[in-house]
Amino acid sequence: MSCNHKNGASEKVLTGNIVDVLAKDIYPGEVTIKDGKITSIKRIDGEFDTYIMPGFVDAHIHIESTLMPPENYARMAVENGVVAAICDPHEITNVLGIEGIDYMIDNSKKARFHFNFMLPSCVPSTNHETAGATIDAQQTAQLITRDDIIGLAEMMNAPGVIYEDADVMAKRFTQASKRFSTSSQSPKLILTAEVKGPRLSFLSFPM
């Protein structure tokens, strides 16, 4: 990949094999960047050994498992082509509660990286452990409205969904009624939700 400057340092032109993930095509091309934004992409003649492609998005990660704070994780991730991440900080939240969420979000702002944080849905993870914190449905309803939280993270409590635990149902109602996204980690379980007036009914289908 080559890089040339035009019209001063504010405009760059990159040449290489462009990976078009939407058209499922790879072709020699030229990408023009001005003031940090792509202004044009076009085909050109030539042969290149390098590739130009969108950055990867890590769709689900617990950064705590890397034993690094977000800013350090970002440095390592970018070197491997990852430019954004959807984060579920439930490990640190089970120890420190809301303080842990705030730490992860505040630290992530130190990095030039697209961090997106979801709100842990199972704190504690199960009813059979001694955790450092608890986040119930009422707290969930308050936290999920924050601008720096994009939705409710993985619902790991499959029994709580199947047997309609009141706290679990309230948490899922909160995210659905506010049109936030949610993720699930319930093996062999399909969850569907149907809004009926002011209430939300959940149907669980074990497979």
Map each language-model feature to its residues:
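A cross-domain feature marking catalytic cores of carbohydrate-active enzymes
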Residues: 61-63, 88-89, 117-121, 154-156, ...
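Functional cores that coordinate and move charged inorganic groups
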Residues: 169-207
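N-terminal metal-binding scaffold of metallo-dependent hydrolase/deaminase domains
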Residues: 1-46
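Di-metal (Zn2+ and/or Mg2+/Mn2+) metal-binding site signature of metallo-dependent hydrolases
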Residues: 50-73
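The start of beta-strands in P-loop NTPase/AAA+ ATPase cores
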Residues: 10-11, 29, 53-55, 186
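Histidine/acidic-residue-rich catalytic or RNA/ligand-binding cores of hydrolases
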Residues: 69-70, 98, 164-165, 190-199
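Divalent-metal coordination cores built from histidine and acidic residues
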Residues: 74-179
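Active-site regions of enzymes building and remodeling cell-envelope glycoconjugates
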Residues: 44-49, 200-201
